[in-house]
Amino acid sequence: MLKDSGDIMWTEGTNAIIVHSYVHQPLVNVRPGLALGPHGSHINVNTTWWKDGKAWVDYLNRAQTLLQRGRVPSDVLILAGESLPNRRTRVTSYDWPVVHAGYYFDFCSPKDLLDSIKISDGKIVAPSGVKYSVFSLAEEIRPTLNTLKAVKKMLDAGIAVCGMRPIGSPSLSDDDAEYAKLVNEIWGADNSKNPRKVGKGTLYPEVSALRALTDLKIEPVISAAKNFKCIARVCDEASIYFIVNTNMSNANGEFSIRANGDKTPEIWNPETGEIKPLPQWKRDGQTIKFSLEFDPKESEFIVLRDGAEQKHFEKFSAQKAEGYVKPENIDIIEAKYRLRGTKEGGKDVKEILEKVYPDGFSVSNRLFGDPYPNKFKELYIKYKVGKRETEKIVYESENHFWKGLEWMPPQSIYPTVLDGAPAMVFEINGSAEGELSDGAKFSTKVENLPRPIKLSSDWSVEFAKDLGAPEGEIAFDKLVSWTERPEFGIKYFSGTAKYSKSFDIPEDFISKNRKVLLSLGEVRETARVKVNGKDAGILWKIPYEVDITNLVKPGKNTVEVEVTNLWYNRLVGDEIKSPLKAGETPKWVLEGKSRADDNSRYTFTLSKGWTAESKPMPSGLIGPVEIRAAEVVKAD
């Protein structure tokens, strides 16, 4: 959820995320300690996933380094308004069509308009050197006389101006006759709704700048497929485009970006730091058009910079082989949005869920409404997959990736780059064809990918000590949420547990130009992976999948997965065994101890959003876990 929220904020202009209450933790002997309750995210050294959070922080650092470069390439300058205090505090409904069409804008004050900006070669020029093609009064209908004079000056110089006909000046010192005359000169006496020439420029008697941008034939900075959000930055050496897949499932997006000059596109991955050429794209005048495959909620940077253009795909299409198994259809029997931890009442949301579940969804008031304001809620689902009937609970503010209500790894065929040359990744048997940038056509088929190696049974699990779980190794015959185990100390465990297992890889599973992928399926919440004793990385978001090609060998192998969940379950378990009154601080906390003397309580915090009746959250390595092969084939 932190990544999802941060990504969206970045696309709306934020470029520095600060952990603002990291230092506000006076309780060093107890966990989780003081919390922000419903007012923010609890992130400090007492957080269960603090060490694994490095992967998320690295992601923030890489992304914000790029997002802080240069400036947003705005084409429109908008007057922020004449009111005092200023009513123009945020982007309005009039602005969003411009943003959604792929353009950007900046605001200016009336003082900026009069004292700072200049007109040169049909452009508005800011002191910073930024040039704008369109000026907008937005919804301001009471500009001052001086503002109108500045607007007339821009029109005479050839600027396109957008704005509704003023109804009068807000200033008693303005001359009414001069004001009315200037309004008629700009908007005309007939009050027409059509654009009109004024001087060398054009007046658009409307709030939105979209028609003016279109008439001026200004290409969008970036045009994106549905359910993708974007923002762009430009600096002297590069153009930077940040793209977010807001879908809860894999998505292949079609994009068009403004590309002045002959710079070539690259993919910069903020999760890994990897930089590679964009595999599929085509230059079309002053734009570059491309397709790109995204994982659920994945974000990527496309960076245009100087460099020799390499051979790449211009056209690419793929067909999965016959026999590709799709997830079974889901029959939703019952769906209630209800108070967390209760079984009665709730809002019936079955019809809403049936419309959104195939692509995944976020459990929120935005989707379901708010039947219980200021209360913690949950979504209860009763459903059928085939003949199997199942129940599931998803908590408010959780994102849910729904493929048969079990996470299934993507099975795609997509373009990539191998050793600097165009290639294709086959995660499933099938065929691909298309055309390269040198005009060569290609057609490729893969038919003999080995079946995945299933690893969802017979794991050894060891829970962290002194947090209430049984000590020593515990056999998990099958992977389940900790909340489904009979042991109280596991059902209500919070912290880290290490899963261990050995497995065999057949000789023919590994070959040249074949990737070996470890897919963990559903994980709550983070996973630190080792294969054959070597670090494979930290997995902290869907899909919980990692490339282990260089870590495995034919024959016997081992895998270790350290999974960390949230504090919620242990807090509920402690409330069952040793309930506290609101505001009560136990003696052992005041004495500086880390837990109750009788081990009846392992946690303490002053914020409380649960009771002894609350249900614990799904936790641990839930799976299904499997090792898959993917063939990488060059487009020769």
Task: Mark where each language-model region is.
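Carbohydrate-binding surfaces of carbohydrate-active enzymes
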Residues: 1-329, 404-496, 504-511, 626-635
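Glycine/proline-rich low-complexity spacer/linker segments in large multi-domain proteins
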Residues: 310-325, 440-457, 565-623
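Extracellular, modular beta-sheet/disulfide-rich ectodomains of secreted and cell-surface proteins
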Residues: 324-408
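Short, surface-exposed tryptophan/glycine-enriched loops
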Residues: 344-357, 504, 546-556, 567, ...
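Extracellular Ig-like/FN3 beta-sandwich strand-entry sites
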Residues: 376, 427-431, 554-556
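Short strand-turn-strand beta-turns centered on an Asx-Gly dipeptide
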Residues: 386, 437-438, 530-537
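Aromatic-lined ligand-binding clefts that engage carbohydrates, nucleic acids, or primary amines
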Residues: 503-505, 509-532, 540, 552, ...
